[in-house]
Every structure is written in structure tokens, then in C-alpha cells.
């Protein structure tokens, strides 16, 4: 990293930061957010939920263990830009395959280091997330010539669009089934550093080797969701985000997983309508043939889309929840869990439908972190129980999903 290679960060409110260029050179625009994770930057960079965003790492030193491809959450990086206080140039880790700087260049990610990330984080916390632009390389001369006003107009007009379509794990084919995978005993150890499922928090009492069939709707699914299901013996069919309700039901899965993903959940009206149809079908089955009902589990964006399909509302948070240290309380037991989170929207917990019960609440701001639906076999959480590079406190929710599927199968 050349200390003389300048980079600028310009925010929509006119705030200006000068630092050192990292990664690729050029200019990039996105929604500027911050994450409080001390580790897990590989997972952050490859998490599709960060699509369209410039990510600020609040921890002052990033990159000290390098890049490990086995820890990727998807096939590539999705961030629009990357901001760190200090980038480690000499990583040390027996699993390290490249430096963070090398990865950023290979992925074409434009970044900036050496700025006061604490001041930037305070600004975003007090004013809310805002659009920004990172400028480096040859673009510096053009910026100096034109002045910031021209760029501010572009920055303010930026909006994340077509997010779900952009982050598909594989090519979308009009709602066609993309992939079906079963359990590979070597698959779990490959992606968990050789740890056994129990060492990652799997409930020993949870049903195992049941070969449950789970339809995973890919809204930008993190790889660890599929890994957690597969290591519990599930056969996973990965489906495009726009798969029709009738196509999903024709697969006769034991369970439906609604994945994480980027963007404003309320904009996905077509997807919400398909999930609504599945829930209505489930509701009818519960009246006449409850053994045919399908268990549903939603995570993050999946939690929000399920809530919208059931009549709840969502709203944008001032600066979101991003990082691996967010405390949530389970409503029934009062127990507190530390969770990994990455979202800018939340389900409004006022005026929830009568059949929706809040199961978890955020202890920092009181927002809804989970819902249980009493009229159909469905539940969802706002946080990430599958988190790697984060806490495993709520990993048991995957076991709860298996138990829900087993309860449905026991009555057949």
C-alpha cells in the first residue's frame, strides 16, 4: 500500500475525509454504513446483504489474519466500497491464503484507509446512514478539477435497486429449481475448520439423519445457512428469489427457509405475494390436514418478508444493526443472547397481527428481533443464528426448525 496514494471519502451532507487508497482505484458510490465486528471481515465482504453499501469497519485494525476462501459466505464480494482505520499488510494465520489488500484488488473493491473511522461512525450514528463516494487513483484529478458540488448531486441521487436479482447465487431461470444438495460428511468440517456440529452448538436432542427436504429461497443466502441445514442431515433445494408459490408447493418440502438478503423488504411486492399464498395455503391445511402443513423459518430479510406477507409493517432504522455483539432477549424465558446482525430495516412491533407473537426483542433499542406465528408452523428471527465470524448463541434455532419439521412428519 503506497502511503502517497491518496483517496477521498465524500458524504451526502458534504462531509469530506482524506486518507490512503486501498484495493482497486477509481470512484464508487453507495450507502455508507458501519459494522462493529472485531473479526469476520471476510464474511462481511462476501455477505450479499451488504449489496450496494460502502462498509465502515469500526474496529481500528482489519486484515490481520488475511483472507480464507473457505470462510466466504458467497462466491464474491458484494460491497460497493470499504473503509478501515488501518489495513494490516502482514497477515499471520495458518489458514491465510492472501492478504486483504490483494483480495480487495482482485474483487475490484475501491477502499480508503487512514481516516478517523470513529468520527465517521459517530456521524452516521447521529445523522443516520447516508450515501457516500470513495474517490482514488486518476479520479482524484477530475474531482479536484470539478469540485465536490457536481459529485454531491450524484451521491444524493443514488439508490439501491434490483438488489435480490443482483445477488442470486446462481443464474436465475424464471423460477426453475437451481440446485438440490444432500449431506456431505466432509462438507461441514471443510467450512468450520474441522469442528463437529456439536462443538458449534447443535442440540444433541434435535432430530438427526431424518433427511428432511428444505426449500431454501435465495434472497441473497449466506452459505452458512445451507451448511447448517446440511450438517443436520437435510436435503436442501436452492430456489431463486422469484420462485412461484405453486412451484415451491409442488416440491412438497418438509420445510421452507427464507434467507437473508439486501435492500428494502417492502419493495419486493411480488415475492411478498408468493409467500402470502404459501402462508394462506398453510393456514388452510392447518384447518383440515395439519400434517400437510409446511414448516417455515425466516432469517433477516426472510423474517421481514414473512412478516409483510402476514400483514405486519417494516420501517428503516436510523443507522441499522451491523456487527457481532447485539444483545437480544427471548420474550418467553427472559434469557439474553449475543447475536450477529446485519440489517437496516426492522419489523414494527406495534400493532402486530393477533396471530404473531414477538419472540425476541433488541435490548439496545427495543426493536423486534423475532416472531412466532400461532396459526401456522412458522417462525422467524431478525438476527443471524448461522453466524460464523460471530456468536453461536442462537444456533439452536436450526434445531428448533428440525423439531418443527419432525412434529409435522410425526402426524403423517
Please provide the spans of the model-predicted regions.
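RNA-binding accessory domains that recognize and position tRNA/RNA substrates
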Residues: 2-182, 187, 191, 198, ...
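Active-site-proximal beta-strand elements of phosphoester/diester hydrolases
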Residues: 213-218, 339-340, 379-383
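Cysteine-nucleophile active-site neighborhood
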Residues: 260-349, 388-406
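Residue-level detector of beta-strand face positions
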Residues: 8-9, 327-329, 370
Amino acid at each position: 500500500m503506497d502511503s502517497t496514494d491518496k483517496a477521498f471519502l465524500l458524504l451526502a451532507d458534504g462531509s469530506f475525509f482524506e486518507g490512503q487508497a486501498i484495493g482497486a482505484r477509481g470512484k464508487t458510490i453507495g450507502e455508507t454504513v458501519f459494522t462493529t465486528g472485531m473479526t469476520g471481515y471476510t464474511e462481511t465482504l462476501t455477505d450479499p446483504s451488504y449489496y450496494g453499501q460502502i462498509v465502515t469497519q469500526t474496529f481500528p485494525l482489519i486484515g490481520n489474519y488475511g483472507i480464507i476462501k473457505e470462510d466466504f459466505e458467497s462466491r464474491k464480494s458484494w460491497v460497493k466500497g470499504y473503509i478501515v482505520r488501518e489495513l494490516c499488510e502482514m497477515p499471520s494465520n495458518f489458514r491465510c491464503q492472501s492478504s486483504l489488500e490483494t483480495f480487495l484488488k482482485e474483487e475490484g473493491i475501491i477502499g480508503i484507509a487512514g481516516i478517523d473511522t470513529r468520527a465517521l461512525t459517530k456521524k452516521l450514528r447521529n445523522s443516520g446512514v447516508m450515501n457516500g463516494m470513495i474517490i482514488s487513483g486518476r479520479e482524484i484529478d477530475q474531482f479536484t478539477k470539478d469540485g465536490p458540488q457536481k459529485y454531491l448531486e450524484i451521491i444524493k441521487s443514488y439508490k439501491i435497486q434490483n438488489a435480490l436479482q443482483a445477488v442470486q447465487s446462481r443464474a436465475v431461470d424464471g423460477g426453475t429449481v437451481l440446485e438440490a444438495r444432500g449431506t456431505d460428511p466432509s462438507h461441514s468440517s471443510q467450512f468450520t475448520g474441522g469442528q463437529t456440529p456439536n462443538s458449534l452448538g447443535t442440540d444433541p436432542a434435535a432430530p438427526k439423519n431424518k433427511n428432511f427436504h428444505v426449500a431454501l429461497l435465495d434472497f441473497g443466502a449466506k452459505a452458512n445457512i445451507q451448511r447448517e441445514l446440511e450438517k443436520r442431515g437435510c436435503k436442501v433445494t436452492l430456489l431463486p428469489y422469484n420462485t412461484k408459490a405453486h412451484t415451491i408447493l409442488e416440491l412438497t418440502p418438509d420445510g421452507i427457509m427464507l434467507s437473508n438478503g439486501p435492500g428494502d423488504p417492502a419493495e419486493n411486492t411480488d415475492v411478498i405475494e408468493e409467500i402470502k399464498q404459501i402462508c394462506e395455503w398453510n393456514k388452510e391445511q392447518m384447518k383440515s390436514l395439519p400434517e400437510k402443513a409446511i414448516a417455515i423459518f425466516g432469517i433477516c430479510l426472510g423474517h421481514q418478508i414473512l412478516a409483510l406477507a402476514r400483514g405486519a409493517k417494516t420501517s428503516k432504522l436510523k443507522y441499522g444493526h451491523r456487527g457481532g455483539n447485539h444483545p437480544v432477549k427471548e420474550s418467553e424465558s427472559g434469557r439474553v443472547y449475543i447475536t450477529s446482525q446485519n440489517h437496516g430495516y426492522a419489523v414494527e412491533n406495534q400493532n402486530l397481527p393477533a396471530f404473531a407473537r414477538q419472540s425476541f426483542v433488541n435490548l439496545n433499542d427495543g426493536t423486534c428481533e423475532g416472531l412466532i406465528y400461532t396459526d401456522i408452523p412458522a417462525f422467524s428471527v431478525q438476527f443471524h443464528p448461522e453466524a460464523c465470524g460471530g456468536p453461536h448463541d442462537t444456533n439452536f434455532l436450526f434445531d428448533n426448525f428440525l423439531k418443527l419439521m419432525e412434529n409435522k412428519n410425526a402426524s403423517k
